[in-house]
Swiss-Prot record:
SUPFAM superfamilies assigned to the protein according to its UniProt record, in alphabetical order: GroES-like (SSF50129)
UniProt protein name: Co-chaperonin GroES
Top-level taxon in the UniProt lineage: Bacteria
InterPro entries: Chaperonin_GroES, Chaperonin_GroES_sf, Chaprnonin_Cpn10_CS, GroES-like_sf
One of the record's GO cellular component terms: cytoplasm
Species this chain originates from: Acidiphilium cryptum (strain JF-5)
Function statement: Together with the chaperonin GroEL, plays an essential role in assisting protein folding. The GroEL-GroES system forms a nano-cage that allows encapsulation of the non-native substrate proteins and provides a physical environment optimized to promote and accelerate protein folding. GroES binds to the apical surface of the GroEL ring, thereby capping the opening of the GroEL channel.
Length: 104
């Protein structure tokens, strides 16, 4: 099944939470919080402004984003847990993550 969001909605896949702390302590599943970081899978065409013109979204598929703890609606599409949220629920785009992983 292919899903295409409408208006200013965005489909997000949560990124896995860290298994260990910086000090090397392993975090058990029961103590983990849901991650507030994700990857944009699909975006809608945008919302309409007062003049009726479609305003494109700032995020695009593949962007790594940060969102609020209670943002979005959890759905299951093709057996995968995803979130559908409005663009306004997104706090920002995380840039430069590839270089961060290389340095670690």
């Amino acid at each position: 099944m292919k899903f295409r969001p409408l208006h200013d909605r965005v489909v997000v896949r949560r990124l896995n939470a860290e298994e260990k702390t910086a000090g090397g302590i392993i975090i058990p599943d029961t103590a983990k919080e849901k991650p507030m970081e994700g990857e944009v899978i699909a975006v809608g065409p945008g919302a309409r402004n007062e003049a009726g013109a479609v305003v494109a979204l700032d995020v695009k598929a593949g962007d790594r984003i940060l969102f609020g703890k209670w943002s979005g609606t959890e759905v299951k599409i093709d057996g995968e847990e995803l979130l559908i949220m409005k663009e306004s629920d997104i706090m920002g785009i995380i840039e430069g993550t590839a270089s961060k992983k290389k340095a670690a």
